[in-house]
UniProtKB/Swiss-Prot annotation:
Pfam families: TGT (PF01702)
Cellular component terms (Gene Ontology): cytosol
Single GO biological process annotation from the record: tRNA wobble guanine modification
Pathway stated in the Swiss-Prot or TrEMBL entry: tRNA modification; tRNA-queuosine biosynthesis
Function, as annotated: Catalyzes the base-exchange of a guanine (G) residue with the queuine precursor 7-aminomethyl-7-deazaguanine (PreQ1) at position 34 (anticodon wobble position) in tRNAs with GU(N) anticodons (tRNA-Asp, -Asn, -His and -Tyr). Catalysis occurs through a double-displacement mechanism. The nucleophile active site attacks the C1' of nucleotide 34 to detach the guanine base from the RNA, forming a covalent enzyme-RNA intermediate. The proton acceptor active site deprotonates the incoming PreQ1, allowing a nucleophilic attack on the C1' of the ribose to form the product.
Organism: Granulibacter bethesdensis (strain ATCC BAA-1260 / CGDNIH1)
Family in the record: Belongs to the queuine tRNA-ribosyltransferase family.
Molecular function in Gene Ontology: metal ion binding; tRNA-guanosine(34) queuine transglycosylase activity
Name this protein carries in UniProt: Queuine tRNA-ribosyltransferase
Length: 377
């Protein structure tokens, strides 16, 4: 069995879990949301600001970092933590999802993938071994196995072939991974929306990865199918290992997944929305470009303690986006990340206190009601 990175379960409420992930770069309370720092930066945020939201772990991307600035350069400069000024844990995506999405620019074979850079057209190759090697050079706290993200929709035969390839690659990743105290390697469960393939994938991975991701979801299958796949897959995974749902998602997606037993999440949604004037709030989603906010002196979310909400009005954010000022995306990105972290803290507290079902009802009712005062007024 591989050594080190561990999860301490503290409470369970139904299938939901509150735990602490222990790593070489610090402890992370779960459930946790990981802001996405694809190119060694969380877009529109200083890393001190990311820390101020309550984030305990961030995500980097192997594909983007290997192309620019390069893994060797990052390693020579002290590793990704020093390079991007983030002392806490970093999880790196293996690069598989990005490479597979290149379609016409890549060629897949049983040993790996040859692809052209989207930046300059240069040719590169990723294999399970080279992906692990790059992630080691980056000094990732959590390394992800290199896999093929199954397309959606896929026939059962296509999904089976893709899953089997990913399982062979996972075994090679496990062999290539160099264990260190407080570092870990996560396997990725594949199989699309087919329960029998998900079962086969879990069996093939075995129980000696440090954690397990559920991949191949949030790719167009819809929430009902995603939750059904989680309902089948999560109980098959080792109880004492962290469970990571990749690329998810909306607050309601996260709530439903936490209630099913997921511990870790990442998604570009809060940062991307922040750059396009969409605010996630305790009252649902607001578009700050909407004319209804032009004279609205209230904070975006009265329950939020971020700078956008404690220092500025909805009218000011509306003005910034209408004027094309860069401060608008900066403030709203901070707000969205702050809201996501607040959501995770609330879910953790509810699990610890055995009131998650009640908390979920309250959250969903508030999201559905929206900004009632303005609507009624």
């Amino acid at each position: 069995m591989l050594m080190s990175l561990t999860l301490s379960l503290q409470a369970e409420d139904g299938r939901a879990r509150a735990a602490t992930l222990h790593t070489a770069h610090g402890d992370v309370p779960t459930p946790t949301f990981m802001p996405v720092g694809t190119a060694a930066t969380v877009k529109a945020m200083m890393m001190d600001s990311v820390r101020a939201t309550g984030a305990g772990i961030v995500l980097g991307n192997t594909y983007h970092l290997m192309l620019r600035p390069g893994a060797d350069r990052v390693a020579a400069l002290g590793g990704l933590h020093r390079f991007m000024d983030w002392p806490g844990p970093i999880l790196t995506d293996s690069g598989g999802f990005q490479v597979m999405s290149l379609s016409s620019l890549r060629k897949l074979d049983k040993d790996g993938v040859t692809f052209q850079s989207h930046i300059d057209g240069s040719r590169h190759r990723l294999t399970p071994e080279s992906s692990i090697g790059i992630q080691h050079k980056l000094d990732a706290t959590i390394t992800m196995a290199f896999d093929e993200c199954t397309k959606f929709p896929a026939t059962h035969e296509e999904a089976a072939s893709s899953m089997e390839l990913s399982m062979r690659w996972a075994a090679r990743c496990r062999d290539a991974f160099v264990p260190r105290d407080g570092y870990g390697l996560f396997g990725i469960v594949q199989g699309s929306v087919y329960n029998d393939l998900r079962t086969q994938s879990v069996t093939a991975l075995g129980d000696d990865f440090h954690g397990y991701a559920v991949g191949g979801l949030a790719v167009g299958e819809g929430q009902e199918a995603m939750f059904a796949t989680l309902d089948h897959t999560l109980p098959l995974l080792p109880r004492g290992k962290p469970r990571y749902l990749m690329g998810v998602g909306t607050p309601d997606d996260i709530l439903g997944a936490v209630m099913r037993g997921v511990d870790m999440f990442d998604c570009v949604m809060p940062t991307r929305a922040g750059r396009t004037a969409r605010a996630y709030t305790s009252q649902g989603v607001m578009n700050m470009r909407n004319a209804r906010y032009a004279d609205d002196g209230r904070p975006i979310d009265p329950a939020c303690d971020c700078p956008a909400c404690t220092r500025h009005s909805r009218a000011y954010l509306h003005h910034l986006f209408r004027a094309g000022e860069m401060l608008g995306p900066m403030l709203l990105t901070w707000h969205n990340l702050n809201y996501y972290q607040s959501l995770m803290r609330g879910l953790r507290s509810a699990i610890m206190e055995g009131r998650l079902e009640q908390h979920a009802v309250t959250l969903r009712a508030a999201w559905a009601a929206g900004d009632r005062e303005k609507q009624d007024g």
